[in-house]
Amino acid sequence: MARWGTIYSRAVSVPVYEQRNQPEGVPPLALTGERTLPDIPEENYWFRRHLVVYEWIAARVQDLRVLDLACGEGYGSDVLARTAASVVGVDANPEAYEHARLRYRRENLRFERGLVATFSAPADAVVFLQTIEHLADPGAALEHARSLVGEGGVVFVSTPNVGTLAPKGASRSDNPWHVHEYHEAEFEQLCAAHFATVSMYGLFHARKLRAHDQALRLGWDALHPRLRLTGRFYEWFTPAIATSDFLLRAGGDAPLRRALDFLAVCRP
């Protein structure tokens, strides 16, 4: 993980960090860059950036049967289970599955090990976050998700905005796990090819992250190395980031080309 001078970049090639302070009997997961994890202070920016979308969705799936496809560590499935009638978290990775199964326990929550493309169970809502950029055939995955909810259901799909994720002047990020990264129009068109209605949202910085962005524009990233403040500042700042430091906005209310991530709310 890169320090925050290049604040929002990630070093994804070496699993340097591991989850800390896990409950007894729960094996910690190593951070590889393929998925975000809680309980790693250096990863907190990315964890909160993903968590806030789960919290937003949880407020909209009350009393529904929910599938969380490619659920990873399981934290998002746990958030959804606070409001949903039932949640099934699905992931193909054996370590992630075992960790999630042991760590997150609710009567209305269970985890299954399986492939996104083949897992089948009736649902009112499918949650499919930060995964489509990893797939060689995203259309097939969306079609499968649509078939799981049927008429009257809803599918939530998110992906990074390559326009803000990639380094300046580059056509994509350096994340080796990503097969294809999307601009707004391309992502919306992909979803619209499989759903009758698609409502687009964008995730943006808020509160102290907006203030940090402004500081960068004023030259903070050039100044703090000279003052030898980089390490000390970000050792405090990064763990202090909260979900309230992000904001989801509807496409009609904000220029989504500047969003961090896109969220498509799709209905058959």
Predicted regions and their residues:
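A short glycine-rich, Lys/Arg-flanked "PGG" loop and its adjoining helix->strand segment in the class I
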Residues: 139-151
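Short catalytic micro-motifs in class I SAM-dependent methyltransferases
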Residues: 130-134
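A structural helix-start
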Residues: 135-139, 159
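Short, glycine-/aromatic-enriched active-site segment of Class I SAM-dependent methyltransferases
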Residues: 157-180
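Substrate-binding/catalytic lobe of Class I Rossmann-like enzymes that use SAM or dcSAM, i.e.
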Residues: 190-215
